[in-house]
From Swiss-Prot:
This protein's record includes keyword Transport: no
UniProt xrefs under NCBIfam families: menD
Primary role: Catalyzes the thiamine diphosphate-dependent decarboxylation of 2-oxoglutarate and the subsequent addition of the resulting succinic semialdehyde-thiamine pyrophosphate anion to isochorismate to yield 2-succinyl-5-enolpyruvyl-6-hydroxy-3-cyclohexene-1-carboxylate (SEPHCHC).
Record keywords, A-Z: Magnesium, Manganese, Menaquinone biosynthesis, Metal-binding, Thiamine pyrophosphate, Transferase
Gene3D superfamilies reported in the protein's UniProt record: 3.40.50.970, TPP-binding domain
GO-annotated molecular function: 2-succinyl-5-enolpyruvyl-6-hydroxy-3-cyclohexene-1-carboxylic-acid synthase activity; magnesium ion binding; manganese ion binding; thiamine pyrophosphate binding
Pfam families: TPP_enzyme_M_2, TPP_enzyme_N
Cofactor field: Mg(2+); Mn(2+); thiamine diphosphate
Name of the protein in its database record: 2-succinyl-5-enolpyruvyl-6-hydroxy-3-cyclohexene-1-carboxylate synthase
EC supergroup of this enzyme: transferase
Associated pathway: Quinol/quinone metabolism; 1,4-dihydroxy-2-naphthoate biosynthesis; 1,4-dihydroxy-2-naphthoate from chorismate: step 2/7; Quinol/quinone metabolism; menaquinone biosynthesis
Family membership noted in the UniProt record: Belongs to the TPP enzyme family. MenD subfamily.
Length: 553
């Protein structure tokens, strides 16, 4: 067995012992030992993608949906650099990736050798752990070094602050197994009981809940994050404090408010609803109005990590690991009744407006899609307007898991992340999967639709809002600039039907709201297009705000 093959086989075996079940491979020559070892191991399901950026976001989707580490493999050079956006998203979102980059041996670095760049510490502070593994040598002691290093990286990816780790692996030729090669000087097998080389206790101690003070005018804010929303919903029920839940908090159920985005944009409402206390969890940031509202609270208790807590507008006064309601709390207050009445009025006004036209607008699509999906479904929300429209009009419901790339909030890798999330969701026994994204996100990651004939395929319906450009900019300050359309609107004229045909995927176009439920029924990977007008959508969002304001004044 040659050294490169030995390192790869030992590394993959140890990862499988630790619990690795998914690996994504971007093809390349220098990474051959890793690729061959992975596809030979029946404990690991492998996915091959020709584009490193697509591969890396596929891994993000797999890891995010499964809540388990996923391995990601590439060759040397720019291949490793193309992983960087996904590594940043994994860092900010707390997604566990095991990034394995193949590299040239030290004697080829800095010499002008082909496909060779400096990969040492390539991802900087975005990784929880980095190791330059070193060139494998045919000597005793290497197996213990390799296996213990893998265990250390695995633990770092899942410790108190989960995230990506990076092992840089220098492989010398030969890169493929050689028949009848020299025997290895020590057994390459791991522990005889099949357990990992090092068993690391990753159990997190549950923090002692801090009892909150009793105030009538409290508010609970649930931002993006993978946490259990049940304690926050219970806190709301015990205190009567309104719960403002972003869609990817998965706390928008029961009595959570779904109209806070519009309510907090009404000056009279905000003036009459000054909070005494805000309790927040996760990473809020979808709504400028919500962030502005946080500044109005004299006390802001953040529930989160004592170091990496979210405080985007620097209003935190306390950071705790968990909270509990004060014994004197009562949910029956004028404060709770006022918020509930405003929510009911806002929701009714929004529904009247959206239901007044059977044409499928962007807002109605977001509302109806979230409502129609069957229990047990996964919904991936694209960045920019799709997630914001869901935030504006998605009604509270149970039985739906909603995720998105909210760490860095880029549109890159959207399709690939959705595919990965769907694959993991269904591998774990979940139901159907759906994605809501814009046309630019689709075009930005068309390679995510290209699955080889032997690749695992998800049941995923991708609903594409096609407004021929970047709709979010129509909501921002630059919308009135004379060069807006070219520089920000970025019309492209690409037909989604052509994109589907290129990838060999089924395609459906939906125009009327009544046709949406039927269009969502189907197996496999498929595209559903809803064509809209950016200017009309911007007007409808303004009309929604005006309708809600009129209803609660």
């Amino acid at each position: 067995m040659n050294p490169s093959t030995a390192l790869a086989r030992v590394l993959v075996d140890e990862l499988a012992r630790l619990g690795l079940t998914e690996a994504v491979i971007a093809p390349g020559s220098r990474s051959t030992p890793l690729a061959l070892a992975l596809v030979a191991d029946t404990r690991i399901r492998t996915h091959v993608r020709i584009d490193e950026r697509s591969a890396s976001f596929l891994a993000v989707g797999l890891a995010r949906a499964s809540r388990r580490p996923v391995a990601l493999v590439c060759t040397s050079g720019t291949a490793a650099a193309n992983f960087h956006p996904a590594v940043l998203e994994a860092d900010q979102s707390g997604v566990s990736l095991i990034v394995l980059t193949a590299d040239r041996p030290p004697e080829l670095r800095g010499t002008g050798a082909n496909q060779t760049v400096n990969q040492i510490g390539l991802y900087g502070s975005a990784v929880r752990f980095f190791a330059e593994v070193g060139v494998p040598e045919r000597e005793a002691g290497m197996v213990a070094y390799w296996r213990s290093l893998v265990c250390r990286a695995w633990a770092a990816a899942q410790a108190n602050k989960p995230g990506p780790v990076h092992l840089n692996l220098a492989f010398r030729e030969p890169l493929v197994p050689e028949p009848g090669g020299q025997p290895w000087p020590e057994p390459v097998t791991g522990r005889p009981d099949g357990k990992p080389w090092i068993t690391v206790d990753l159990q997190r101690n549950e923090p002692e809940p801090v009892e909150l003070p009793w105030v009538e005018r409290g508010v609970i804010v649930c931002g993006d994050g993978d946490y259990d929303p049940i304690p926050l919903l219970a806190l709301s029920a015990q205190t009567g404090w309104p719960l403002l839940a972003e869609p990817t908090s998965n706390a928008r159920r029961a009595e959570a408010l779904s109209s806070y985005r519009q309510l907090l944009a009404v000056p009279e409402f905000v003036a009459a609803h000054e909070p005494e206390l805000v309790v927040s969890v996760g990473r809020p940031g979808l709504s400028r109005q919500l962030l502005a509202y946080l500044r109005r609270a004299p006390r802001h208790v953040v529930v989160g990590d004592p170091v990496a807590f979210a405080d985007p507008v620097r209003t935190a006064t306390d950071v705790v690991g968990a909270v509990t309601a004060p014994p004197s709390a009562t949910p029956d207050t004028a404060w709770a009744a006022s918020w509930a009445a405003a929510e009911a009025a806002a929701r009714a006004a929004a529904d009247r407006l959206l239901d007044s036209d059977e044409t499928l607008s962007e807002l109605r699509l977001a509302r109806d899609l979230a409502a129609h999906l069957p229990a047990g479904s996964l919904l991936f929300a694209g960045a920019s307007m799709p997630i914001r429209d869901l935030d504006a009009v998605m009604r509270p419901r149970c039985g739906l898991r909603l995720i998105g790339n909210r760490g860095v909030s880029g549109i890159d890798g959207t399709v690939s992340t959705a595919v990965g999330a769907a694959l993991a969701h269904q591998a774990d026994g979940g139901g159907e999967a759906f994605a809501l994204l814009g046309d630019l996100a689709l075009l930005h990651d068309q390679n995510g639709l290209l699955l080889g004939p032997d690749e695992p395929r998800p049941n995923l319906t991708i609903v594409v809002v096609n407004n021929d450009g970047g709709g979010i900019f129509s909501e921002l300050e630059q919308a009135g600039h004379p060069d807006f359309e070219r520089v920000f609107g970025t019309p492209h004229g690409v037909a989604v039907e052509q994109v589907a045909a290129t990838a060999g995927l089924p395609y459906t176009r939906v125009e009327w709201a009544t046709d949406l439920p039927k269009a969502l029924i189907g197996d496999g990977l498929r595209l559903v297009e809803v064509r809209t007008d950016r200017a009309a959508s911007a007007r409808l969002r303004r009309a929604l705000q005006e309708a809600v304001a009129a209803a609660v004044r």
